[in-house]
Amino acid sequence: MRWMTFAIAILSTTVSPSGQSQRPAIIDLWTIGKPAFGIYAPNENAGPRGQGPRPAVYTREGGEKLAMNPLYDFVFLNLEGSYDGAAIKAIADGLRSISAAGHKALIVRIPPIEKDGADATRTRVKEAFDAGADGVTIPHVRSVDEAKQAIGFFRDARANVWSPANRTGDRIAMLMLEDPAAVAQAREIADLTGYSILACGIGSLAQALGGDREGAEAGTQKVLAEARRAKLVDMLTFNAQDAGKRVKEGFLALLTQGAAADDAIRAGRAAAGR
């Protein structure tokens, strides 16, 4: 009887009426200081190489395929360039299929505030969660004030955000700093409350620095240091060659893509003792 009571209690705290987990497993990894590994949701309409970009397509079937791979802790759906609410639902539904190998968190990157304005961004944050996302990323945050505004969108969405001040949260809020002026404010932004992940967009930062990869790496390390000081997660892209280095440095969310993604994640898991 005691075992049945315990089991019911666990189920009631981890599963919603729709069957969607209330607390992504990656949060439990982060709580014990273990890194999580994820993959970009691939565009299912990429087309042959050399023919230029096509409109991105994301389907439930694509989500189901990702769900069956036990290596992935999370899936990162990049809608920064072209927001598509239907794509969020399609991938979320696919990730929750009965064939899924564990619960993979879905983190959605939406367009930056500067692109379509605060009202559109606020609406998209709520819409993404309503469609089944576990987390939302707001890229190109330019200042402390804009970071405060972005964090407010998660409050407006009534998301129970996991953060250093709220370890019982079940949703993920992520901010990205991608230009030198924003990175210079990393300490002040890290000191803000109400969000989960602070990351540096290393590629965008390098571009903003005129292609200076060393400068972008230095900026990335600055953001990492501030994130770790504030007990925030930091996310970064990686590959098989630098997996061990990034794990050792303390990045708790590592993201990859492409044909070599599984090999990169295997290398990362091995380095992390997973």
Locations of regions flagged by a protein language model:
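Bacterial N-terminal signal peptides
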Residues: 5-14
